[in-house]
Amino acid sequence: MKSDSEGHKSSSKIQIHKGKILLKPRSWVNLGYSIANSEKETFFLKNAIPGETVDTVLLKRSGSLFWGVASEIQEVSSERISSDCSIFPRCGGCSYRHVSYQKELEIKKFLLQETLEHFLSKKHIQIPEIEILSGDPNGYRNTAQIQLGFAGNQRLAGFYEEFSHSIVNLPEEGCKNLPQEMNFAFAEFLKQEVKGSKQILKSKTLSFRLEGTKVISYKKKSVSFSENIRIPELKKIVWEIPAGGFSQVNRYLIAPWLEKIFELVPNNQNRILELYCGSGLIAIALKSKTTSWLGYEISSDCVQQAKRNVLLNGISSCDFKTLNLETDWIDSEEVLNSSFWIMNPPRAGLSKKVLQTLIKTSPNGFLYSSCNHSTLVRDLSLFLNKDYKLSNVTLVDFFPRTKHFEVIVKVEKKD
C-alpha cells in the first residue's frame, strides 16, 4: 500500500463530469479519507478508494483544501464492496463500509505505521511490528447517542450527515454498529412518542447504554459490567460506571484489551501510577502486578466509583484521587517515582503538565493507550530519546467501520 508521499501527485486541472468534480484518489489518509490532487487543490474524499475515478460532491472548503463524498464511481476498484447500510456514505458515522473489514484493518494499520514513521524516523526510533486486536465489526457498541430533531412535523432521529448538522434518519433495521436490543429501544421510544404515550422529548439527543441485554438511560442510571479475563488465569472481574461516566464502547474487546495491557506491564512493581484512571477498570485487572496502585482522574464521581470497584473485587492497596491533569501538577515526589506508569488520556492526548512531568521524571517505563493515534505519536515524539525504546505497538479496533481506532504502546528504558 503506497503512502501519500509515494503516490504521484496529479498536476491536471479539475475536470467536471455531469456538474460534479471528477477525481482520482491516490492514497488513504487519516480520518477515513482518500486523497486526490489537482494543480492547486487537495481533496479529501469519503467513499472513494485509491485508484478509482469518482464523481465528487464537495461539502467543505478551507483555502485550497476541499472535503467531499464520491457520489458516483466511474472506474471501480476491485476492493470495493456493496455497502450493507442504506444510509452510507451520507451518514457521518461510518467511513469504511465500501471495503471489507479485513481491508479496513489493513488501512488502519497502514495509517498508524505511516504516522509513527513520520514523527519518529528523524529520531531514529525503531518501530516494532504492529499487532492488531479486533472482534465482530457488527453490533459492538455498548453506548450510543442518537441526534433528534424535526423537519416540519416529521420526527428525525439518527446521526449527523457528513460535514453537517442535518440529521440522517436511521434505517428501518437500525444501525449496524448497535446491538439489536439498542436499536429496538430507540425504535420503541420513537414509536411511543408518535402514539402519544410518551411526551415528545425536547432534548436534542437520546442516549442509551447496554447492561447485559438491558438498555438503560446513559445519563440517569449507573451500570454494572462483568468480564472473564485471563490475567493470566481466568478470572471474573466486576465494575460499575456512574451515570454519564466514561466506558470503553466496544463490548467485544474490553477483555482482550485488558489482557493485552496485563501482558505488557512488567511484574513485581513497587507502585503503578495511573493517569486518567476513570472508574478503576485497569487497576482491577492489573493489581497483581504491584504492591501499590495510585490513580488520578478529574471526575470526583469516577474516583469514588473506582474506590468502590476495587472493593467489589476484594482488592486492597489501591487509591484514587481527584486531580485536574490539565491544570494541576502531581506534587508528590514519592508518587512520581512510581516504577511504572499507565496513561489513558482523552483524544486531545497528554496535557502539557503531564508531558513535562513525564519528561522530567523519566520513569523506567510506561504504557499509553489512546483513541487518537495522531496525538499519541505527537506525545511520543516529544518524549522519546536515545535512552528509551518503543517495545510494543498494538492497534485495538474498538470502533469498526468508523475512522477511529485505539492504540496501545509500551515504552521502556534501554538496558
Swiss-Prot record:
Task: Provide a GO biological process annotation.
Answer: rRNA base methylation
One molecular function GO term is: metal ion binding
Q: Which UniProt keywords apply?
A: 4Fe-4S, Iron, Iron-sulfur, Metal-binding, Methyltransferase, S-adenosyl-L-methionine, Transferase
Q: Which InterPro entries match?
A: MeTrfase_TrmA_AS, NA-bd_OB-fold, SAM-dependent_MTases_sf, U5_MeTrfase_fam
Give the matching PROSITE patterns.
SAM_MT_RNA_M5U (PS51687), TRMA_1 (PS01230)
Any one Pfam family here would be tRNA_U5-meth_tr
Residues holding S-adenosyl-L-methionine: 248, 276, 297, 344
Lineage, top-rank taxon, reads: Bacteria
Q: Where is the active site?
A: 371
Q: Which residues bind [4Fe-4S] cluster?
A: 85, 91, 94, 175
Give the EC number(s) under which this enzyme is classified.
2.1.1.-
Transferase: is it a keyword of this entry?
Answer: yes
Question: What family is this protein classified in?
Answer: Belongs to the class I-like SAM-binding methyltransferase superfamily. RNA M5U methyltransferase family.
Descriptive protein name:
Uncharacterized RNA methyltransferase LIC_10086
**Record organism:** Leptospira interrogans serogroup Icterohaemorrhagiae serovar copenhageni (strain Fiocruz L1-130)
